Each structure stands twice: as C-alpha cells, then as structure tokens.
Amino acid sequence: MSCYVTHSRECNVVISGSETDTNRVTYYNIKVNVGEVAWTVRKRYKEFADLHAKLVNDHTVTKDILPGKKIIGNKEPDFIERRRIGLEIYLQTILSFLQKSMPEELFDFLEFDKYDVMLIVKKLATEFYQNGDVYLANENCFNFNVLQLYAISERLKLPCPDSENNKFNFSHVLDFCLRLKHLAIKGGQHYVNASNIVYNNLNFELSSFKSVIKLECFNIASNMIYNIKPLRNTVRAITIYNSKLKKPEDILLCDYVHKEWSSDMDSNMVWNKVKSVDFSWNEIETLASLTVLTPNIRTINVNGNLITTIEDLTALTNLSRLSLSNNNITEVFDLHTKLGNLVCLDLSSNKISDLTAFSKLFSIEMLDLGSNYVANIDQIKHLTKLHNMNYLVLSGNPVSTIVDYRTKMLGLLNKRTSDFCLDNERPTQKELDTVAIKHALRLAKEGKTLFDR
C-alpha cells in the first residue's frame, strides 16, 4: 500500500479519461501512483474548484492556474478533452509545488486516507482517541481489516515524530491495541476499493496486541502474519473461518518458516492458554498438531473441512467437545481409544453407516449423527450402553424414515423419561406411554415381571 512519507518523489497523477453520467455531470478519472501502488479517483470540475480555492487561500497557490469555468458548451466532447488535459496539468503542477509539504486538502482530494499508511493510522488514532474507551468496555470486539493492520505494522518501522495535534498521535493506536481483549481480523482476495492493492497480499504483525483473549479471523492469508508471538501468552479462544488452512499449524505457527512440531518443541511456540479452537470452513485434513500446540484445549470445532479419519486425540486430556460436521468421514474405528472422555461429539453431515465404533464411548452425553448414511435399525444397538447420553440426533439418515421411528429408537435405547432428547425434540407423553406399553408387553412375552428389568 501507499506510504507518501517514504515515496514522495515517486508520486504522480494523470487524468486517464472522463465520464458523463445520466444527469449530464462529467467526472474526471484521476489515476494516482505512489511507487508501485495505484488507485483511481473520480472528481467533477466543482470539486477541483473547491480544492483550488482552499489551496489559494491557505497555501499560496497561484490563482490563475486552474482551467476556467465555462457555462455554455461545457458538455461538448472537444471541450471536455481540453479541460481533462488542463486539469491534469493543474494537478501535476500543484503536486510538484507542494510535494515537500503536502497539505491535508490535497491528500483528501486524492483519497490518500483510503490507501496511505500514515493517513490510515491517523484516522485510527482519531477514532481511538474519541471512542477507544467505549470499544474496550466490557471486552467488546473490535474489527480490524488487513489494510489497517498492515498500516500499523509499517508505522512501527517509521521514525516519525508524533503530530502536534494530540488526537492524531500514534500512541492512541498503540494504547488501544495493548488493551484490546477481543481482536477480529478480516481479509479478502479482492482489491481495496479502486486500487491495485489486494487485502491478502499485505503482510502484517500483531506484536502490539498483548492482552488479547479471543482471536477471530475471517478470510485471511495466515502466511502473511509474520509476528504473532505475544498472543501465544494470552489467547484462550481462536476462531479462523474460511481462510484455506490446510493444517492447524498454518495459523498456530504462522510466524515460523518451518512449521514443524514435536512433543519436545520450544515452549514459546505452544499456545498453553487456548481452551477452544474453531477452524470451520477451511481445508484441514489433520488435527494431529493440536495435541502439542494446544495441550490444554477443551473444545475443537472443525466443521466444513476435508477430514477423512478421526485421529488419536487422547493426549488432549481436557478435550470434552469435538465437532466434525460436514467433513468426508466414511468409517470410524475404536473411538474409545482415540477420544478419551469426550462429552459432546458432532459427526453430522458425513458418510457414516456403521455405528459399532461408538459402543464404548461411555462418557458421551451429546451425540449428533444427523445426515449420515445409517440405514439399518440394528445399528442403534451399538448405542444402548451409552447410559450418560441424553441427546441424540439421527434425523437425515435413512433409518429415520422407518415407521414409528421415534418410539422404536426410544425403546431400543431404553429411554423412557422426558429428560432424553431425540432429534432436538423431547419425547411427548404419548411417545413415552407407547414405549412403556411396548416394554411391558415384551417383558410379558419373555415371562418376566417389571421388577426383573
């Protein structure tokens, strides 16, 4: 992105063309270049005239260098072209004249505030000076875009004195970053406004954020973060959506060139305080690195990824909730040897048909198997020993279409109280009565009494 302070001699403008809208107002397309950064600004003649008046009054610009106003014939193509050339010469002249002391009015006219490091930081400083305490109250979230974080990162490298006006001081930005506890970052593969800047082509660092407890990122390029070290000491919850992560270490070790992990790795690389991660809607195929990089984690959400198998996560002794919805899991084996004392497991929207592997998950309380391929009602018998289970979802499976599905499920699972929830619905009294009657009939048929249950 632009940095006029360091590239003032590489700044130039041209008016590449003009457009007349349906209201017969003519706009001139100004292309601004600062080094390799370029953007386009659309202005009408009136805005040139307003700018010129300010420059004449406050910055000793010669009054007669702006092309004159014309009332009659000002929509003729020849006149518009002559005016385009004249306005281009005008802009180039004042830019050359004011290069070393670029006035705020000219920065605003050319929309530097949207693309320039110093002006973006200046805008942030003003915002935090006025409203920073409001944003920080109650640990509220603040959303930064990648452009703003790049600007802060670059400003840290510049030996520029603070502004004479206190509200513009960079210290307001640093103080806000230091105290912020809920940081959200938004990126994107698209251009920034009318420029050649792409959000996710900008690198940035997060060394100024030393109190963040919750980190959220949406559509970012994790490889563009070159310092995330302070967050490893404070963050408890991480959410990374739609960012094309291949592995958890893509973000957890984003500031390391070689993203290698092992059980004896440097403790400074480990996120010891993280209790939950949400890596939904990425391209993750394995969770293995979490066993080392987030050893104290309790909740993992990797919905909407590319996982095909459930790995051994027993090293995560505090793990209680695991969500693997919308992945590519077709078969599961020996889950009790891989998931420890899991309480909640979501495997909805996969391709599972055999439930044998679930038979020894004795700690499970909530199990979501909705929208899988379970077709045979006999598979439900593998869940009958899960006595702690009080929530089960099977809707969306072929088995849920059988006659008297709900009462058959409740009967097989021996769930005869309203505390149990099947497919997000508690049993009705009628369903409970039906299950009780069928149970009594079965006992009678077997020659048992109710006290022999």
Please tell me what each predicted stretch does.
Residues 129-300:
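LRR N-terminal entry segment and analogous cap-like coil->beta motifs
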Residues 22, 33, 39-43, 47, ...:
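Short amphipathic alpha-helical molecular recognition features
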Residues 45-48, 52, 80, 84, ...:
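Generic preference for well-ordered alpha-helical elements
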Residues 31, 46-56, 67, 88-96, ...:
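Amphipathic alpha-helical interaction motifs in eukaryotic regulatory proteins
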Residues 199-210, 222-247, 252-270, 274, ...:
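Leucine-rich repeat domain C-terminal region
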Residues 1-169, 438, 444-453:
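Phox homology (PX) phosphoinositide-binding domain
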Residues 28, 46-47, 63-76, 102-113, ...:
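Short amphipathic alpha-helical segments embedded in low-complexity Lys/Glu-rich regions
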